[in-house]
Curated annotation (Swiss-Prot):
Keywords: Cell inner membrane, Cell membrane, Hydrolase, Lipid A biosynthesis, Lipid biosynthesis, Lipid metabolism, Manganese, Membrane, Metal-binding. It catalyses: UDP-2-N,3-O-bis[(3R)-3-hydroxytetradecanoyl]-alpha-D-glucosamine + H2O = 2-N,3-O-bis[(3R)-3-hydroxytetradecanoyl]-alpha-D-glucosaminyl 1-phosphate + UMP + 2 H(+). Mn(2+) 1 binds at D7, H9, D40, H196. This is UDP-2,3-diacylglucosamine hydrolase. Its cofactor is Mn(2+). GO terms for biological process: lipid A biosynthetic process. Binds 2 Mn(2+) ions per subunit in a binuclear metal center. It is an enzyme of class 3 (hydrolase). Pfam families: Metallophos (PF00149). CDD domains: MPP_YbbF-LpxH (cd07398). It is a peripheral membrane protein. Hydrolyzes the pyrophosphate bond of UDP-2,3-diacylglucosamine to yield 2,3-diacylglucosamine 1-phosphate (lipid X) and UMP by catalyzing the attack of water at the alpha-P atom. Involved in the biosynthesis of lipid A, a phosphorylated glycolipid that anchors the lipopolysaccharide to the outer membrane of the cell. Substrate binds at N78, R79, D121, S159, T163, K166, H194.
């Protein structure tokens, strides 16, 4: 069994989500061969050198899962792209490139966070290119802690405001981008998060049936994609 999740946006202000995640680690994830976290694991991340006690506790919990024998893979999201090898080493997880193709359920599957599929959101894509530039990343990681904290708050506030103002289709994936990316990677299944619109979409890639599986965000409930002998099962669950 393989589990895939994304968009938990873990933060101290949402202890219900934290409890649900820790319950998953102590439960189903212990029986999984691997757990994939496809971005926005944390609501914000300003550097491995600035972990709060809360973030350290999550790191330790992931480490316990890894030590129990479940492989853990972590992909950057738009909220936590400053997570580095320091955190991953401490947590016992592997940083996964976005995009990545893995063998899953007997086929090659493309994994992405999903933000790069939203090409109609021109403002966001421009900001993303700037922030992910290696020079920008180096500068961000070396800014004083107080400056990074202030910048993170500003970016989150602006992101929320802009998302509310933008049309739904702009902040969702660009329909023609999806089959193009899938064809470029030679896959018939794509799994991603980011849009907070959980669903399994049928489409055609290179004249053949294909599917796009969108993971759900953890807010009013949690979501997992379980891959086992029965196939790909996208399921919500209520917080206890």
């Amino acid at each position: 069994m393989i589990l895939l999740i994304s968009d938990l946006h873990l933060q101290e202000e949402r202890p219900d989500i934290t409890r649900a995640f820790l319950d998953l680690l102590d439960g189903r994830a212990r029986h999984a061969k691997a757990l994939y976290i496809l971005g926005d694991f944390f609501e914000a991340w300003i550097g491995d050198d600035a972990m709060t006690p809360f973030q350290q506790s999550i790191c330790q919990a992931v480490r316990q899962l890894s030590d129990s024998g479940t492989a853990v893979y972590l992909m950057h999201g738009n909220r936590d792209f400053l997570i580095g090898e320091g955190f991953c080493k401490a947590a016992g997880c592997t940083l996964l490139a976005d995009p990545s193709v893995i063998s899953l359920g007997g086929e090659q599957v493309l994994l992405m966070h999903g933000d790069t599929l939203c090409t109609r959101d021109i403002g966001y894509m421009k900001m993303r290119r700037y922030l992910r530039n290696p020079l920008s990343l180096w500068i961000l990681r070396h800014l004083p802690l107080a400056t990074r904290q202030k910048l993170a708050r500003k970016l989150r506030s602006e992101s929320r405001a802009q998302t509310r103002m933008k049309a739904t289709e702009i902040v969702d994936v660009t329909p023609e981008e999806v089959p193009a990316v899938m064809a470029a990677h030679g896959v018939k299944t794509l799994v991603h998060g980011h849009t907070h619109r959980p669903a399994i979409h049928k489409l055609v890639v290179n004249g053949e049936p294909a599917r796009r599986i969108v993971l759900g965000d953890w807010d009013r409930r949690g979501w997992t994609l379980q891959v086992d002998a029965q196939g790909f099962q996208l399921e919500p669950f209520e917080f206890s």
